[in-house]
Structure formats: structure tokens, C-alpha cells
Amino acid sequence: MLSALGGNLSNARQSIAQVLNFALVLSTAFMLWKGVSIVSNSSSPIVVVLSGSMEPAFQRGDLLFLWNRGERAEVGEIVVYNVRGKDIPIVHRVVRSYTEEDKKLKAKKTKAGLPYVAPQKLLTKGDNNLADDTELYARGQEFLDRKEDIVGSVRGYIPGVGYVTIMLSEHPWLKTVLLGVMGLMVVFQRE
């Protein structure tokens, strides 16, 4: 009787160890993501190109690394932005930039002895598109605000690696299969 109880206790310990190991992997991945987000100053420091609008510079499925520490975006720079009200990252090139001075804010900051920098407005366009992005922006929006809309500027990429993400979003059943396989691996893994 005692040996049967000891065997069940050993199995319970193994199961708990497997669950804790899986939780450790997930929490490590989350901490790495948050760390990269803080260093890059971007809410989404790694994005996948979802369309062919930036060909030939970037292909669909390329994995992009973003940096959002610059105060200004230059014409010709490739940026990633989110349309207000939608959470879909768009990768396009800055084709026009201008600053819009807010006289009330400037007076307020000058009076307080703080430096005033006029907000930068940007117009973007995909390299493979005929027209600029004004049709993609939120209703009534003609330009992107550098501080509010830009997720980051592209600083590097790995070709094709992000295609797995595209496959998982286009074929939802693949997520189920992948999660099932991962779950079975955790359950049947023996150390």
C-alpha cells in the first residue's frame, strides 16, 4: 500500500515539475519581450510584414526589428504605425514630413522655462503602392503624428521568419494543432 502511494506521489511531483517548467518558459519569454520593449521604447519591437506593399524592400513574412528612440522621423525612413482605432501594424516609408506649431502650448512651455518642440506630422506610402496612405489613416486624419501613431523605425530584419505568424493567423486550425502538439509534448516529456 505504501509503495503505491509513493508511486502516485512521484507522478504528482513530475506533473507539477512539468507545469512549473512550462510556466517558467512562458514567463521568461514575457520578460524578454518586455525588456526589448523598454530598451527599444516601442510597444511592439518586433513585427511581421503582412502584405506586399513594401516590395522589393521587404517581402511578406519578413520579421522586422523596431527602434523608437529617435525624436524625429526623416523622409525616406521606413516606419511602422498603427491606424487609430485598429491594432494592425503597417510598414511604410515616410514620403513627407512637416511640423505644426501649437502657439498655446509653445507659450505655456516657454513661460515655464521648458523647451518646446513642435509636433512632427508624417505622410507615408508603401514602396509598391501607387498612392500615399491617406486612405488608410483614420477618418479625418491626413497625416500621422510622430509621437502618437508611430510604433517605431525599422532598424533590421530577418527575411521570411515571420511567415509562421501569417500562416497561424490565416489558418486558425493550425493554432489548435500546434497547441495540441505542444501540450502533448509537455504531458509526455520525461526527465
Curated annotation (Swiss-Prot):
SUPFAM superfamilies for this protein: LexA/Signal peptidase
TM stretches of this protein: 19-39
Keywords: Endoplasmic reticulum, Glycoprotein, Hydrolase, Membrane, Protease, Signal-anchor, Transmembrane, Transmembrane helix
Pfam family, one: Peptidase_S24
Cytoplasmic topological segments: 1-18
Protein's UniProt name: Signal peptidase complex catalytic subunit sec11
Entry's localization field: Endoplasmic reticulum membrane
Gene that this sequence comes from: sec11
Catalysed transformations (reactions): Cleavage of hydrophobic, N-terminal signal or leader sequences from secreted and periplasmic proteins
Domain-related comment: The C-terminal short (CTS) helix is essential for catalytic activity. It may be accommodated as a transmembrane helix in the thinned membrane environment of the complex, similarly to the signal peptide in the complex substrates.
Residue segments, region C-terminal short (CTS) helix: 177-188
Subunit structure: Component of the signal peptidase complex (SPC) composed of a catalytic subunit SEC11 and three accessory subunits SPC1, SPC2 and SPC3. The complex induces a local thinning of the ER membrane which is used to measure the length of the signal peptide (SP) h-region of protein substrates. This ensures the selectivity of the complex towards h-regions shorter than 18-20 amino acids. SPC associates with the translocon complex.
Cellular component GO terms, alphabetical: signal peptidase complex
Function as written in the Swiss-Prot or TrEMBL entry: Catalytic component of the signal peptidase complex (SPC) which catalyzes the cleavage of N-terminal signal sequences from nascent proteins as they are translocated into the lumen of the endoplasmic reticulum. Specifically cleaves N-terminal signal peptides that contain a hydrophobic alpha-helix (h-region) shorter than 18-20 amino acids.
